[in-house]
Amino acid sequence: TTEKLIQLKGKKDIVKIMIMGLGSVGQYLLDYLCSMNDERIEIIVAGRNRDKMIQDVNIVKVAASIRGTLRTHISIVDGCDLSDIDSIRKCLSINRPDIVVNTSRVYVGLKYGSISWNNFRAYGIWTPLSIEYIKNIMAAISSENSNAIVINTSYSDVTIPWLKSTGYPPM
């Protein structure tokens, strides 16, 4: 991953960042990237629900316009189903991102730990659900021979150790 970052740092043209899943974390990331006011960043928002993504992207665009920082190109790719490796592969093949950020949740609107007991996180429930999406993303990236850097924010304290234990390359 360090080598990939060094190569990316030396890149002189557009850096493509794909955000998979535009929930609250994805929206914060999108807003942050827009606030960087960098025209060399292209953001690709990928997910299932086009109408929701358009609405969320427009909110961020309006905020960036008000701040005077809307120099980033943002495109929306719908039909990217993270439970379907071929769907992810197609999305990656068409867009060729340099960085892929998985901010997805299997169930929309459920916050981390919302189905938990007092002092015990319900990892038994979330682990297999969370692992499926990032596992599929990593499989699609491998099959595309992509050199993209992958960042996973979806239950990362559970999913990243699992990925490492199965031999997936470091993110």
Model regions and ranges:
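A short, basic/flexible loop-to-alpha-helix module at the beginning of a structural domain
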Residues: 1-15
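NAD(P)-cofactor binding segment of oxidoreductase domains
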Residues: 93, 118-144
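N-terminal Rossmann-fold NAD(P) dinucleotide-binding loop
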Residues: 26-29
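Glycine-rich phosphate-binding loop and adjoining beta1-alpha1-beta2 segment
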Residues: 35, 43-71
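Rossmann-like dinucleotide-binding core of oxidoreductases
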Residues: 138, 142, 146-171
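Conserved NAD(P)H cofactor-binding loop of Rossmann-fold oxidoreductase domains
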Residues: 103-108
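Glycine-rich Rossmann-fold phosphate-binding loop(s) that bind the pyrophosphate
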Residues: 22-23
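Conserved Rossmann-fold cofactor-binding substructure of NAD(P)-dependent oxidoreductases
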Residues: 79-95
